[in-house]
Protein backbone atom coordinates (compact mmCIF):
# COMPACT_ATOMS: atom_id res chain seq x y z
CA UNK A 1 0.00 0.00 0.00
CA UNK A 2 2.72 2.46 0.97
CA UNK A 3 4.81 1.91 -2.16
CA UNK A 4 1.74 2.05 -4.43
CA UNK A 5 1.99 -1.54 -5.62
CA UNK A 6 -1.60 -2.14 -4.49
CA UNK A 7 -4.48 0.30 -3.97
CA UNK A 8 -5.60 -1.21 -0.68
CA UNK A 9 -5.18 -4.21 1.58
CA UNK A 10 -7.26 -6.17 4.05
CA UNK A 11 -5.20 -6.58 7.20
CA UNK A 12 -5.58 -7.99 10.69
CA UNK A 13 -3.74 -5.24 12.51
CA UNK A 14 -3.83 -1.45 12.66
CA UNK A 15 -0.20 -0.35 12.57
CA UNK A 16 -1.22 3.25 13.32
CA UNK A 17 0.78 4.44 10.30
CA UNK A 18 -0.06 8.14 9.90
CA UNK A 19 0.14 7.92 6.10
CA UNK A 20 -2.66 5.34 5.88
CA UNK A 21 -6.39 5.18 6.48
CA UNK A 22 -7.55 2.15 8.50
CA UNK A 23 -11.26 1.30 8.32
CA UNK A 24 -12.44 -1.53 10.60
CA UNK A 25 -14.77 -3.83 8.68
CA UNK A 26 -14.91 -7.08 10.61
CA UNK A 27 -14.50 -8.12 14.22
CA UNK A 28 -13.37 -11.51 15.31
CA UNK A 29 -12.26 -13.30 18.42
CA UNK A 30 -9.52 -15.74 19.20
CA UNK A 31 -10.49 -19.22 20.35
CA UNK A 32 -8.73 -22.39 21.44
CA UNK A 33 -9.10 -24.96 18.66
CA UNK A 34 -8.62 -28.61 19.67
CA UNK A 35 -8.98 -32.02 18.08
CA UNK A 36 -12.11 -34.02 18.81
CA UNK A 37 -10.83 -36.47 21.43
CA UNK A 38 -12.31 -37.94 24.60
CA UNK A 39 -10.15 -35.59 26.67
CA UNK A 40 -11.40 -32.42 24.95
CA UNK A 41 -14.99 -33.69 24.76
CA UNK A 42 -14.88 -34.18 28.54
CA UNK A 43 -13.61 -30.60 28.96
CA UNK A 44 -16.35 -29.33 26.65
CA UNK A 45 -19.09 -31.21 28.48
CA UNK A 46 -18.14 -30.53 32.08
CA UNK A 47 -20.26 -28.21 34.21
CA UNK A 48 -17.67 -25.47 34.68
CA UNK A 49 -16.40 -23.95 31.43
CA UNK A 50 -12.84 -24.79 30.45
CA UNK A 51 -10.32 -21.97 30.90
CA UNK A 52 -6.94 -21.50 29.25
CA UNK A 53 -5.10 -22.89 32.27
CA UNK A 54 -6.76 -26.26 31.51
CA UNK A 55 -4.70 -26.39 28.30
CA UNK A 56 -1.25 -25.32 29.58
CA UNK A 57 0.34 -28.77 29.37
CA UNK A 58 -1.22 -29.69 26.02
CA UNK A 59 0.89 -29.62 22.84
CA UNK A 60 0.28 -26.25 21.20
CA UNK A 61 1.01 -25.03 17.69
CA UNK A 62 1.82 -21.35 17.25
CA UNK A 63 1.47 -19.10 14.24
CA UNK A 64 4.69 -17.60 12.91
CA UNK A 65 6.25 -14.39 14.23
CA UNK A 66 4.73 -11.37 12.55
CA UNK A 67 1.31 -12.95 12.19
CA UNK A 68 -1.52 -10.75 13.46
CA UNK A 69 -3.05 -13.78 15.19
CA UNK A 70 0.28 -14.48 16.92
CA UNK A 71 0.50 -10.87 18.11
CA UNK A 72 -3.03 -11.01 19.52
CA UNK A 73 -2.26 -14.34 21.19
CA UNK A 74 0.90 -12.85 22.73
CA UNK A 75 -1.18 -9.97 24.14
CA UNK A 76 -3.64 -12.47 25.61
CA UNK A 77 -0.82 -14.47 27.22
CA UNK A 78 0.76 -11.30 28.60
CA UNK A 79 -2.55 -10.17 30.15
CA UNK A 80 -3.01 -13.57 31.79
CA UNK A 81 0.58 -13.71 33.07
CA UNK A 82 1.52 -16.75 30.99
CA UNK A 83 4.80 -16.97 29.10
CA UNK A 84 5.68 -19.33 26.28
CA UNK A 85 7.94 -21.09 28.78
CA UNK A 86 4.74 -22.18 30.57
CA UNK A 87 3.44 -23.82 27.38
CA UNK A 88 4.25 -27.04 25.54
CA UNK A 89 4.99 -25.44 22.14
CA UNK A 90 5.56 -28.24 19.62
CA UNK A 91 5.63 -26.24 16.37
CA UNK A 92 5.48 -22.83 14.76
CA UNK A 93 3.81 -22.77 11.36
CA UNK A 94 3.30 -20.00 8.86
CA UNK A 95 0.43 -21.69 7.04
CA UNK A 96 -3.02 -21.59 8.62
CA UNK A 97 -4.26 -24.64 6.72
CA UNK A 98 -1.31 -26.70 7.99
CA UNK A 99 -2.16 -25.72 11.55
CA UNK A 100 -5.81 -26.64 11.03
CA UNK A 101 -4.88 -30.04 9.53
CA UNK A 102 -2.49 -30.67 12.42
CA UNK A 103 -5.28 -30.01 14.91
CA UNK A 104 -7.73 -32.28 13.06
CA UNK A 105 -5.09 -35.03 13.03
CA UNK A 106 -4.62 -34.73 16.79
CA UNK A 107 -1.10 -33.28 16.81
CA UNK A 108 -1.98 -30.38 19.08
CA UNK A 109 -4.14 -27.38 19.83
CA UNK A 110 -3.82 -23.76 18.76
CA UNK A 111 -5.19 -20.30 19.41
CA UNK A 112 -6.77 -19.11 16.18
CA UNK A 113 -9.32 -16.70 14.81
CA UNK A 114 -12.85 -18.06 15.23
CA UNK A 115 -13.64 -17.23 11.59
CA UNK A 116 -10.65 -19.23 10.37
CA UNK A 117 -11.93 -22.45 11.95
CA UNK A 118 -15.67 -22.12 11.27
CA UNK A 119 -15.44 -24.61 8.40
CA UNK A 120 -13.97 -27.30 10.65
CA UNK A 121 -16.36 -26.50 13.48
CA UNK A 122 -19.40 -26.81 11.19
CA UNK A 123 -18.22 -30.25 10.03
CA UNK A 124 -17.43 -31.30 13.62
CA UNK A 125 -13.75 -31.94 12.85
CA UNK A 126 -12.57 -29.77 15.77
CA UNK A 127 -13.79 -28.40 19.07
CA UNK A 128 -13.60 -24.72 19.96
CA UNK A 129 -13.27 -23.20 23.41
CA UNK A 130 -13.65 -19.47 24.07
CA UNK A 131 -10.83 -17.63 25.76
CA UNK A 132 -12.05 -16.45 29.13
CA UNK A 133 -10.96 -12.83 28.77
CA UNK A 134 -13.20 -10.33 27.02
CA UNK A 135 -10.20 -8.47 25.60
CA UNK A 136 -9.22 -11.09 23.04
CA UNK A 137 -11.30 -9.64 20.21
CA UNK A 138 -9.53 -8.70 17.02
CA UNK A 139 -10.49 -6.33 14.23
CA UNK A 140 -9.72 -6.50 10.54
CA UNK A 141 -9.15 -3.35 8.53
CA UNK A 142 -9.30 -2.01 5.02
CA UNK A 143 -6.14 0.05 4.64
CA UNK A 144 -5.16 2.50 1.92
CA UNK A 145 -2.76 5.39 1.53
CA UNK A 146 -3.95 8.89 2.46
CA UNK A 147 -1.80 10.17 -0.40
CA UNK A 148 -3.66 8.31 -3.15
CA UNK A 149 -6.99 9.06 -4.76
CA UNK A 150 -8.96 5.83 -4.92
CA UNK A 151 -10.36 4.80 -8.30
CA UNK A 152 -14.16 4.41 -8.44
CA UNK A 153 -13.92 0.59 -8.67
CA UNK A 154 -11.70 0.53 -5.56
CA UNK A 155 -14.19 2.75 -3.69
CA UNK A 156 -16.96 0.39 -4.79
CA UNK A 157 -14.99 -2.59 -3.44
CA UNK A 158 -14.44 -0.81 -0.10
CA UNK A 159 -18.18 -0.18 0.14
CA UNK A 160 -18.94 -3.80 -0.76
CA UNK A 161 -16.64 -5.10 1.99
CA UNK A 162 -18.15 -2.73 4.55
CA UNK A 163 -21.72 -3.66 3.55
CA UNK A 164 -20.96 -7.38 3.60
CA UNK A 165 -19.36 -7.44 7.05
CA UNK A 166 -21.22 -4.70 8.87
Model feature map: region roles:
Residues 50-52, 59-81, 151, 158:
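Secondary-structure junction motif
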Residues 37-51, 147-152:
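Short helix-loop capping/hinge motifs at secondary-structure junctions, enriched
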Residues 1-34, 42-44, 104, 127-129:
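Short beta-strand-centered segments that line the small-molecule binding cleft or hinge
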Residues 2-6, 11, 78-127:
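Hydrophobic hinge/microswitch elements
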Residues 20-21, 50, 97-98:
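Short acidic active-site motifs
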Residues 23, 53, 100-101, 155:
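Alpha-helical segments flanking ligand/cofactor-binding loops in enzyme cores
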Residues 127-166:
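A late-sequence structural motif
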Residues 22-36, 52-56, 131-139:
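Short Pro/Gly-enriched coil loops immediately N-terminal to beta-strands
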Amino acid sequence: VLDGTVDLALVGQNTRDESCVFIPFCHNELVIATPVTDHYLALKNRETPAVFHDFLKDPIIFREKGSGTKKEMDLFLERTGITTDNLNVIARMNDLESIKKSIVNGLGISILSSRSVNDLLRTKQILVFPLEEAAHKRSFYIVYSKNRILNPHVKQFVQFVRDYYM
